[in-house]
C-alpha cells in the first residue's frame, strides 16, 4: 500500500511522489500476484467531508479514483478518512458524514465495479463504530477493513500514556477498554465479517501522545541499552521497555507479531499488515509477519531459540 494520495476539497487527487508509486507498480513485472493499492487521506487529511456531501461530489470523487487507478495501473484504493464526523485532527466534519461515507463507498463500488480492491482504514472503538462508520452497511461494499489496532495511547499524557499502544489483550499495563481483541470483537458484532478484517501492527514504539521511535531505532539504541530493560507482558502479549523502574516504551517485536498472527489464524481474520515499512529497514518485523503466517511451526522454533518459551496466544 502506497501512503498517501492527497485529496482536496473538490475531490481531486494528488500523488506526492509519482515516481515512487510507479516503481512499486513495476514490482509486479517480477511478481504478477502482487497487489498495489493507493491509500487516500491519512491523519489530518481534509477533503473527504466535501467529497462525500452530494451525489455529484461523490461520483466526481469516484471518477477521479478510477482515473488514478487507470493512470498508475493500480489494483485498488484504501480510504483513510480519520474520521467521519470528527474534527479532532483539524479537518472539516459534518453530522451526516457517517451516512455520507457509506454513500461515497457505494458510488466508488458503482464506478469501479465488483472486483476492484476498496478497503477502509479505521479503528474498532465504540466511538468510531457508533459515530463515524456504518459498519454493517459498508461491509458488503468493501474488500477489506484495515484495522488500525495501534496508537491506543496517542491521546494520552502522564501516567495514562505509560501503557501499551497495541496490546492484543487487556492487562494491568493497558488502557481500560483498549485492546486489539476488543476492537476485533466490536467490529464483528457491528457486522464486519471476520475474514474481511486485516489486523494492523506497529513497526514503531510509542510513549504516550508525543514520543515515537522506529523499530530500527529501538533495536539499535534502546532495547537492553542505556538503562532500558526489555520486558514482556504475558497478559497483553506484547513487549515494553522499563527505565529507572518506570514504563518507558510500548512496541511490537517478533514474538508479539507471531502471537498476533496466530490470533489472525485462530479467529479466521483476513490477514495482517503493518504501519509502516520504512520503520523496519532490516525487514526483521516484516519477515516475522510473513513467517508467522506461512511457516508458523518452523518460525516458532526459531523464536524459542532466541527468546525462550513463547507465550500461548
Q: Residues of each region from the PLM?
A:
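Substrate-binding surface in catalytic domains of secreted glycosidases
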Residues: 9-19, 84-225
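Short, well-ordered coil/turn segments that N-cap beta-strands
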Residues: 32-36, 73-77, 114-116, 141-143, ...
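Conserved, mostly hydrophobic/aromatic
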Residues: 38, 79, 108, 145, ...
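Conserved beta-strand positions
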Residues: 1-2, 74, 79-81, 120, ...
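Active-site groove signature of glycoside hydrolases
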Residues: 64-95, 151, 273
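Glycan-recognition patch characteristic of GH18 chitinases/ENGases
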Residues: 1-69, 162-163, 174, 178, ...
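Short, acidic/polar
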Residues: 53-71, 126-137, 180, 184, ...
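Glycan-binding loop/region signatures in secreted carbohydrate-active enzymes
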Residues: 40, 153-170, 174, 195-263, ...
Amino acid at each position: 500500500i502506497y501512503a498517501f494520495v492527497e485529496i482536496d476539497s473538490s475531490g481531486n487527487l494528488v500523488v506526492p511522489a509519482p515516481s515512487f508509486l510507479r516503481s512499486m507498480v513495476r514490482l509486479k513485472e517480477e511478481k504478477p500476484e502482487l497487489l498495489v493499492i493507493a491509500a487516500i487521506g491519512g491523519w489530518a487529511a481534509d477533503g473527504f467531508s466535501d467529497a462525500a456531501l452530494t451525489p455529484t461530489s461523490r461520483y466526481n470523487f469516484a471518477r477521479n479514483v478510477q482515473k488514478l487507478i487507470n493512470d498508475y495501473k493500480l489494483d485498488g484504493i484504501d480510504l483513510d478518512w480519520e474520521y467521519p464526523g470528527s474534527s479532532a485532527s483539524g479537518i472539516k466534519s459534518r453530522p451526516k458524514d457517517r451516512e455520507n461515507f457509506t454513500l461515497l463507498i457505494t458510488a466508488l463500488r458503482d464506478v469501479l465495479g465488483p472486483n476492484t480492491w476498496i478497503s477502509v482504514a479505521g479503528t474498532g472503538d465504540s466511538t468510531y463504530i457508533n459515530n463515524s462508520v456504518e459498519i454493517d452497511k459498508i461491509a458488503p461494499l468493501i474488500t477489506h477493513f484495515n484495522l488500525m489496532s495501534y496508537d491506543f495511547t496517542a491521546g494520552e499524557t502522564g501516567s495514562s500514556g505509560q501503557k501499551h499502544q497495541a496490546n492484543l489483550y487487556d492487562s494491568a499495563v493497558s488502557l481500560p477498554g483498549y485492546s486489539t481483541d476488543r476492537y476485533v470483537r466490536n467490529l464483528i458484532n457491528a457486522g464486519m465479517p471476520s475474514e474481511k478484517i486485516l489486523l494492523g501492527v506497529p513497526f514503531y514504539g510509542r510513549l504516550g501522545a508525543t514520543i515515537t521511535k522506529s523499530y530500527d531505532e529501538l533495536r539499535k539504541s534502546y532495547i537492553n541499552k542505556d538503562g532500558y530493560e526489555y520486558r514482556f507482558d504475558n497478559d497483553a502479549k506484547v513487549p515494553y521497555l522499563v527505565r529507572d523502574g518506570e514504563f518507558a516504551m510500548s512496541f511490537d517485536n517478533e514474538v508479539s507479531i507471531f502471537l498476533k498472527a496466530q490470533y489472525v489464524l485462530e479467529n479466521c481474520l483476513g490477514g495482517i499488515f503493518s504501519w509502516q515499512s520504512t520503520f523496519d529497514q532490516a525487514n526483521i518485523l516484516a519477515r516475522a509477519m510473513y513467517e508467522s503466517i506461512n511457516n508458523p511451526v518452523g518460525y516458532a522454533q526459531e523464536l524459542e531459540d532466541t527468546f525462550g518459551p513463547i507465550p500461548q496466544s
